[in-house]
Amino acid sequence: MELTPREKDKLLLFTAALVAERRLARGLKLNYPESVALISAFIMEGARDGKSVASLMEDGRHVLTRDRVMEGVPEMIPDIQVEATFPDGSKLVTVHNPIV
C-alpha cells in the first residue's frame, strides 16, 4: 500500500487519538500530544461527516476539559489548527482555547 506523506500524517494522528481515548477510558489524564491528537482527530472526523467549519470550531472546545488533562496542558495549547477534508474540499479549522 502506497501512502502520501499527508495520508501517513493523518494515520499517525488518528493512532495517537486512539491511544488518548484508551487512556481517558482508564481514567488517566492526557498529556500535550495526546490532547492535541484527540481534538484534531475529532475535527477531522467531523469534517468527514459533513459538519460545518463553524460548528467544529465551537464543538472542538468541548472535547476535553481541564480535569481530563495534566496540569499546565491547557495553557500550552492556545489554539489548534487542522486542515480537514470536507465534502467540498480542504479547509483550515482553528479552535481557540480548546481546553476550558
From Swiss-Prot:
Q: Where in the chain are disulfide-linked cysteines found? A: none
Q: Which UniProt keywords apply?
A: Cytoplasm, Hydrolase
Biological-process GO terms, alphabetical: urea catabolic process
Q: What is the official name of this protein in its record?
A: Urease subunit gamma
PANTHER family, per the entry: UREASE
The molecular function terms of the Gene Ontology recorded here are: nickel cation binding; urease activity
Gene3D superfamilies according to UniProt = Urease, gamma-like subunit
* InterPro entries in the cross-refs: Urease_gamma (IPR012010), Urease_gamma/gamma-beta_su (IPR002026), Urease_gamma_sf (IPR036463), Urease_subunit (IPR050069)
Q: List the GO terms this entry assigns under cellular component, sorted alphabetically.
A: cytoplasm
